[in-house]
Design a protein with these regions (language model features):
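Short loop/beta submotifs within extracellular cysteine-rich repeat domains
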Residues: 18, 26-29, 52-53, 61-64, ...
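Conserved active-site tyrosine of GNAT-family acetyltransferases
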Residues: 18-23, 46, 93
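N-terminal strand-loop-strand beta-hairpin
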Residues: 27-48, 52, 116-118
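A short beta-turn/loop motif at secondary-structure boundaries
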Residues: 36-38, 71, 106-109
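Vicinal oxygen chelate
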Residues: 44-45, 81, 90-133
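Conserved secondary-structure micro-motifs at functional edges
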Residues: 47, 55-65, 73
Length: 133
């Protein structure tokens, strides 16, 4: 089912400062920076080998990411695993007793669908399944 780690999502308070850190200190450049109306966040992706680092800054104080930052502060928010079919994976995992946040996948970008698993079922880690069409 899981093919590989796609990315690690990190919640940040200031995306510009976080980008500066990754560029100047770690020496890597973002491959994509965009604002997501769906997640109410500004996002930057940094390729690092076969895995990407996703930096996420909320743009709305009522968003899920803003609430996460308020409660836990900056840091790792989720791990995303690539799968062939998010919806069939969600069905299979629910049959195995995994609690789901999403019963069906959601389209987050033109060619991507995602679904989240409840951290209570995944050792305290918010887990995202991602499918690229």
């Amino acid at each position: 089912m899981l093919e590989k780690i796609d990315h690690i999502g990190i919640a940040v308070k200031n995306l510009d400062e976080a980008i500066k850190l990754y560029k100047e200190v770690f020496g890597i450049e973002p491959s994509l920076i965009y604002e997501s109306a769906y997640t109410k966040a500004k996002i930057a992706f940094f390729p690092l080998g076969e895995v990407k680092i996703e930096l996420i800054q909320p743009t709305n104080p009522e968003s899920v990411m803003a609430k996460f930052l308020e409660k836990k502060g900056e840091g790792i928010h989720h791990i995303s695993y690539k799968v062939k079919d998010v919806d069939s994976s969600l069905v299979e995992l629910e049959k195995k007793g995994i609690q789901l946040i999403d019963k069906k996948s959601r389209k987050v970008r033109e060619n991507e669908r995602v679904g989240f698993l409840n951290p209570k079922s995944t050792l305290g880690v918010l887990t995202e399944l991602i499918q690229e069409d």
